């Protein structure tokens, strides 16, 4: 994948526009989870260190486009950055007709979604963004699958368009896992619905030596083997699709499960064979034997791609399956890449972040890359690298 990298450029004295992913949860004016800002800090610090005139921006939440709304302001992010950086940091609300930035100063441009035409990749808006800078740095992998003015359009018109360190690392890690993986390659796809992950399952069934399914997805595969799943979340209309995948790829289906009669944090868990699920029960986790089988598979893997838990790990009684799988990935010597919101929450819960080779910051973008789709922002950077 050939793109210009920010790390290959001399940014001294240049006006640098960084599109980061600073879309963080905010409560009462305070950032409540700083993972995305922390991930973006090295890019910002590198540009400042090089003596660039640095602007950074992002979307935050889902405001009505074209309207300022204090609730979605980047002010909490600015306050966070002021605490972390020794450089002066200021928020600029109106910047489309130009902004003065001093060397060594960080200017945060207010939420891009306050600008009319952002989501539609409006050409006039894209040109206004591009006029603000000498170098455009796309560093928001999480929005690379969307063709929007601040992620895609600006890059077509800026003098130079490049990939920031975070985006470059993400593309390298995903390329390593998907293009020429060390084998055996094991892919774990969890989550509630087969329908939302069908193309992912299909793509991975062609790449992975072993495909592991978990959560509600696994229930559809259990049903495909002719077992009753009781009141479990599953998709009856996709049972035939699950049967097809079982014939094309090695997919271990749970042999034992943890069930409950209600979907509740306090519901007691009953461990039983997959043959014995009653009509009033729902499967909320895989059983110990199934979890150990998966742990063995993961122990021998050379590449692991992990997207989604294998049970309702948010409920302590139904956490064990995901915990065993998570620890097996952490203990494995394989190159491991993990992505998706639930997966990141599980990694935090079990404290294994430092044992995963690469943690992807992109949710939808991560899945679309895995599906083999072209990400508009990446395609734009590749195109600009040719000029």
Curated annotation (Swiss-Prot):
Keywords: ATP-binding, Cytoplasm, Glycolysis, Kinase, Nucleotide-binding, Transferase. The keyword Cytoplasm applies. Its main location: cytoplasm. Gene3D superfamilies: Phosphoglycerate kinase, N-terminal domain. Pathway: Carbohydrate degradation; glycolysis; pyruvate from D-glyceraldehyde 3-phosphate: step 2/5. It holds the Pfam family PGK. GO terms for biological process: gluconeogenesis; glycolytic process. It comes from the Bacteria. InterPro entries: Phosphoglycerate_kinase, Phosphoglycerate_kinase_CS, Phosphoglycerate_kinase_N, Phosphoglycerate_kinase_sf. Substrate binds at residues 21-23, 36, 59-62, 113, 146. One of its GO terms (cellular component) is cytosol. Belongs to the phosphoglycerate kinase family. HAMAP family: Phosphoglyc_kinase (MF_00145). Monomer. This is Phosphoglycerate kinase. It comes from Salmonella typhimurium (strain LT2 / SGSC1412 / ATCC 700720). The gene is pgk.
